[in-house]
């Protein structure tokens, strides 16, 4: 039977504004999102045996319907008239519960892969409509471009220009519940009319953008996250920010050599996950 081997990239948020709480319980967001080349490796294969099977082998990542990738495959299998099974194998490279969108990226990659394998012919726009029902970040990974994300993250506008940057990701191994962060968020009164540029020509302009309304909540419970920012800045980052709801913090560097050196030194000195990656 046919199979595909695909990469599911992580993301960072250069900016995350929480504008308010919606009647449906979700929060109104405004984010600048960027993919990076730290990727989970996903194999999707059709099978003669009915059903969906997900194998991951990473502690804390479920193999059955509790896995968002399983639910993505199920959503598309229901649209097909083919009597086949789907086998998904995920090699996790992206830290789990880390604010890097690994689960959402896996789901988006499965949507795109199963769409191809089952020859459904669904457009990216249709896959994004299906994806947002699985998770708010899923449409971004189908979109495949640096984007301004609004609403719950499902209204996407491509950035006109954004520089290719070297980024160091640092994760201390702390699992942060996104739901917990939003439940403990104290809303301020940001101005929804604030203009967020759609074009960034330099590292300096991206650094000026860095802001995350969720950071005080996560740092309040896990002060180590604040320490990570200082560690990155001391290591030469031009700017540093927590990604998503944490606990990963990223630093923006001027060159590949500076990023790789910083990642190696941080991993050696602290024992944390540290990786030099490129924006894509």
Swiss-Prot record:
Can you tell me which residues form the catalytic site? Answer: 11, 137
Keyword check for tRNA-binding? no
Alphabetical UniProt keywords: ATP-binding, Isoprene biosynthesis, Kinase, Nucleotide-binding, Transferase
**GO biological process: one example:** isopentenyl diphosphate biosynthetic process, methylerythritol 4-phosphate pathway
Protein name, as recorded: 4-diphosphocytidyl-2-C-methyl-D-erythritol kinase
Entry EC no(s): 2.7.1.148
List positions binding ATP. 95-105
């Amino acid at each position: 039977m046919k199979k595909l081997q695909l990469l599911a990239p992580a993301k960072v948020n250069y900016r995350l504004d929480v504008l308010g709480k919606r009647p449906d319980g979700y929060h109104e967001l405004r984010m600048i999102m960027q993919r990076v080349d730290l990727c989970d490796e996903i194999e999707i294969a059709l099978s003669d045996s009915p059903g969906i099977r997900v194998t991951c082998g990473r502690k804390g990542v479920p193999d059955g319907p509790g896995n968002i990738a399983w639910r993505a495959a199920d959503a598309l299998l229901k649209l097909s008239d083919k009597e086949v099974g789907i086998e998904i194998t995920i090699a996790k490279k992206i830290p789990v519960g880390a604010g890097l969108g690994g689960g959402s990226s896996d789901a988006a990659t499965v949507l795109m892969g199963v769409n191809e394998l089952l020859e459904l012919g669904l457009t990216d726009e249709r896959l994004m409509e299906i994806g947002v029902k699985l998770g708010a970040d899923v449409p971004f990974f189908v979109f495949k471009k640096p984007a301004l994300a609004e609403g719950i993250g499902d209204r996407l506008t491509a950035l006109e220009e954004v520089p290719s940057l070297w980024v160091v990701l640092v994760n201390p191994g702390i699992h942060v519940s996104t739901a917990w962060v939003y439940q403990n968020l104290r809303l301020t009164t940001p101005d929804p009319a604030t203009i967020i540029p759609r074009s960034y020509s330099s590292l300096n302009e991206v650094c000026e953008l860095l802001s995350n309304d969720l950071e005080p909540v996560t740092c309040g419970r896990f002060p180590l996250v604040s320490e990570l920012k200082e560690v990155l800045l001391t290591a030469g980052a031009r700017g540093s920010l927590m990604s998503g709801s944490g606990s990963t913090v990223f630093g923006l560097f001027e060159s590949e050599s500076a990023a790789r050196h910083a990642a190696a030194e941080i991993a050696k000195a602290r024992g944390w996950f540290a990786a030099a990656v490129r924006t894509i």
